[in-house]
Amino acid sequence: MRRLARAGLIGCALWAMSWGGAPARAQEVPPPVIIIVDVQQILRDSLVAKNVQTQMTQRTDRYSKEVSDQENELRRTQDELERQRTVLSADVFNTKMRDFQQRYDALDHGVQATRQALQQAYNDAMTKVENTALQIIADLAAERKANLVVTKAAVLFTAQGLDITQEVIHRLDEKLPSVQLAVPQDAGAGLNKP
């Protein structure tokens, strides 16, 4: 039985040699040089991220007020129509009601389109922030000759000096202090005012 096992090992070794000589050596792996970064903290705490969030909040608040004013106007129109229901002929009432419904539908459609445009503008601005942050991270990795960048969320324990998050935030604040939300002109009147 041992002879068969030894013959099998020799056969495997001969087969390996026939495919390229001696068994391949494992490639030399350089010792790890690790840096750790918290991208979520960067996207939350950097000046540019705070600036984008402030712009988003201001524009959303302003637009919400405009929509609320328009909704109040529509409610007043609807109440007036209900009061006139008994006075107006059925045809006139139905025409006014259709006009009211079209105004209501237009407002609803406009609100949805504007919210989508505003969300897209926010996403575009934050993508620019994230891409700039990733470039800074790559630059820091090159400066420190790091061959492994790990997100802080994946780390349970770290030695002091490996986390570069604050350095990335500092460089991002210098390189990209603000990004304007680029909301299309037709997306909503109040959204385009900074």
Each PLM stretch: what is its role?
Residues 3-10:
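Sec-dependent signal peptide recognition
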Residues 10, 14-24:
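C-terminal segment of classical bacterial N-terminal signal peptides
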Residues 27-153, 178-194:
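Amphipathic alpha-helical segments
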Residues 159:
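Catalytic domains of cell-wall/extracellular-matrix polysaccharide-remodeling enzymes
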Residues 165:
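Short beta-strand-centered segments that line the small-molecule binding cleft or hinge
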Residues 173-176:
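Acidic/polar surface patches and capping/hinge elements
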